Structures are given as structure tokens and as C-alpha cells.
Amino acid sequence: MKGWARLALAGLLMWAASGIARADDVLKAKIGVLRLSSSAPVFIAQDKGYFREAGLDVELKFFDAAQPIAVATTSGDVDFGVTAFTAGLYNLAGKGVLKVIGGMSREKAGYPLIGYFASNNAYAAGLKTPKDLAGKRVAVTQVGSSFHYSLGLLADKYGFKLSDVKIVPLQSLSNAAAALKGETVDAALL
């Protein structure tokens, strides 16, 4: 894990060379993150004091969905974003207003980063595997999110059309989880 923290630290140090706010030789930076395991290297670096040891004063700003992190990075609300490759991120990077400087996580075969969940009622009615998502109401954070993209990959893999799924964008992970628990959707990608 320390290696990932070093990667995050290296990115911050590269950014420091470009003219960042300094106070008493401490570099200040705001990092936009989600409350997900994919941001764990940043959480560990913060909790273990790795940033502080390197002369960095890091403030974490939490977001409810990935796409707003890319927007906040380009607007200057945060200095860095730890986020998924969303449609919005690709758009901003394609316009040259956002740069990808490193990657922190990747899926390993058999260990997906995204969970596929069925509501209790949908499960009891037969929603047992991703191939059963066709015809169901499926919560994602946002249209164009990494969860939306993953749903498209599931459709390709299991032989149904994405248009066969009623996509329900709920703007945050907590809203998607609440909809799943409240049975207002059949499934959610979280």
C-alpha cells in the first residue's frame, strides 16, 4: 500500500513544481475523493502522515459521485481528483483542460471494483446474476458514470441490450443504496 501512497505523493510533488500555494515551505493541496476503497491509498497517506512527512498539507474534499470531481478539478475547487474514468472526465481531458497523471486501482480477475446488488424483492423474484438485469430498474450514480459504463459492459458480456435496462441515475452512491433498500429499484451498481 505504501507504494500507492508514493505514487500519489509523486503526483502531488510534480504539481508542486508548477507553482502551488506555499505557506512556511508547506505545500497545500485539496484532493477530491469518493468514500470508496479505490481512494484508499490517499486515505492511508493522509492517516499515516505520509503527506505531512513530505511537506504537504492535504485537505480531502468528499464527493457523492465521480463525475463532479473532474469538474471540480478543472474549476479549481480541488487541485487533484481521485476519480473514475467517466464520460465527463474523457470530455474534459479531450479538451485539454484536465490531465490524467496516474492510476491508483485496477480490477483483478475475479475481484471487481464495482458490486452488483439486487433488492430483496427482485432477488426473490429471480434476479440472481447480472444476465438477469434485462428488463429491470437499475440504479447508477449518473448517466455517463463508471457505473453506467460498467452496466454497458455487463450488457455486452451477458447478451442483452443496454436499452433493455431502465437506468435510474440517482446522483450519489448513498441515494442508490437507499433506493435499493427501499425497493424503488431492482438493482444497483455500487
Residue ranges and their predicted role:
Residues 12-17:
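Hydrophobic core
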Residues 1-8:
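Bacterial N-terminal signal peptides that target proteins for export
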Residues 176-178:
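Rossmann-fold dinucleotide-binding core
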Residues 18-23:
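Sec/Tat signal peptide C-region and signal peptidase I cleavage site
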Residues 24-160, 167-170, 186-190:
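Short, glycine-/small- and polar/acidic-enriched structural segments
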Residues 182-184:
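Carboxylate- and glycine-rich phosphate/diphosphate-binding segment that chelates Mg2+/Mn2+
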